[in-house]
């Protein structure tokens, strides 16, 4: 087995679509392991020889669910994916070829597109609205709510194509547009077809199964959910690895940031979010990661300047542990 795709899922209505799209587009010796975190999938995932579905009796969280899937994985490489993604044709083969080129001391991702999963459509008058929380038709009103349904689209949109990410001093995820206009990004994109990124968004990453465990990229003590892109990138870079984006493939990710019934599947209290950020900051800022050989200041200097960081904050970090 070359690649194991790990999909943690809790109340994910597009898990079936995600798995079916992956199966349609894989071209390598790839398996899919989905962990249903307490709740059964609805609609149900169809049986397939390449797909393993596990259900936990109670919710264990996204990190623990991903780790459970990785314990069962048979592939040399593992790819963690959110349960609402679409895929480039041959994305698994292209990523495996990418690792053959760059080596295994890497965490890699394809280009991230935005997934246009569905439109809302009123099947009485034909009114449509782009994906989001369940709307009320302005023409027919709430009394015709039963005529409002999702019309599936499942398109990885061509814009934006996200390839550069960072985090600020909080730490909080940010897109890193400035980096895309500097060297070595410009030359690497043109001559190599892949580029370095300071951090990750977190909906997808690929790594050897050995490094997944060795670099401790999915620490359950960080909390059930959130901050995973930063955690994976920090664990990789500060352990002596590289975080690279392969520009020869892509995946589409559906963003759910509008609340109501179009929000995150795990509880997201401000207290829990802060707890995760504090844990990540204390672990990496204070050089507590078990395989850490670089300070966070080393990573900042590599990508400096970075929006959301001041020169004083950088100098303060450089003095930690010295």
Task: Provide a role label for each language-model segment.
Residues 63, 181-206:
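A recurrent flexible, glycine/aromatic-enriched loop bordering the glycosyltransferase active site
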Residues 1-21:
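N-proximal low-complexity "stem/linker" segments adjacent to membrane-targeting elements
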Residues 57-72:
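Glycine-rich, basic loop-to-helix element that forms the pyrophosphate-binding segment
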Residues 20-29:
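Short, acidic, metal-binding catalytic loop of nucleotide-sugar glycosyltransferases
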Residues 28-40, 52-56:
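Short beta-strand/loop segment that forms part of the nucleotide-sugar
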Residues 86, 90-171:
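Conserved donor NDP-sugar-binding/catalytic core segment of glycosyltransferases
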Residues 95-96, 204-205, 210-216, 222-249:
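A short, conserved alpha-helix in the catalytic core of glycosyltransferases
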Residues 78:
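Short aromatic/hydrophobic "clamp" motif used to bind/position activated sugar donors
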């Amino acid at each position: 087995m070359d690649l194991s795709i790990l999909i943690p899922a809790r109340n994910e209505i597009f898990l079936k679509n995600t798995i079916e799209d992956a199966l349609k587009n894989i071209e390598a010796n790839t398996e899919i392991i989905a962990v249903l975190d307490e709740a059964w999938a609805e609609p149900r995932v169809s049986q397939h020889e390449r797909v393993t579905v596990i259900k936990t009796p109670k919710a264990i969280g996204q990190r623990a669910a991903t780790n459970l899937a990785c314990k069962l994985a048979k592939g040399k490489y593992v790819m963690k994916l959110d349960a609402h993604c679409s895929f480039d044709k041959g994305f698994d083969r292209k990523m495996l070829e990418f690792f053959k080129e760059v080596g295994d001391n890497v965490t890699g991702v394809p280009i991230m597109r935005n997934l246009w999963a569905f439109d809302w459509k009123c099947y009485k008058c034909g009114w449509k609205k782009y994906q989001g929380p369940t709307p009320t038709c302005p023409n027919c009103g709430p009394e015709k709510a039963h005529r409002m349904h999702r019309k599936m689209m499942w398109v990885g949109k061509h814009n934006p194509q996200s390839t550069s990410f960072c985090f600020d001093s909080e730490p909080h995820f940010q897109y890193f547009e400035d980096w895309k206009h500097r060297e070595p990004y410009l030359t690497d994109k043109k001559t190599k077809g892949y580029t370095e990124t300071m951090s990750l968004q977190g909906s997808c990453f690929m790594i050897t199964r050995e490094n997944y465990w060795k670099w401790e990229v999915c620490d359950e003590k960080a909390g059930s959910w959130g901050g995973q892109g930063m955690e994976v990138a920090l664990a990789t870079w500060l352990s002596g690895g590289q975080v690279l984006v392969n520009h020869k493939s892509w995946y589409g990710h559906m963003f759910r940031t509008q609340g109501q019934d179009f929000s995150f599947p795990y509880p997201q209290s401000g207290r829990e979010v802060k707890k995760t950020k504090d844990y990540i900051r204390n672990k990496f800022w204070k050089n507590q990661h078990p395989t850490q050989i670089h300070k966070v200041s080393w990573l900042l200097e590599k990508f400096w300047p970075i929006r959301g960081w001041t020169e004083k904050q950088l100098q303060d970090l450089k003095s930690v542990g010295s």
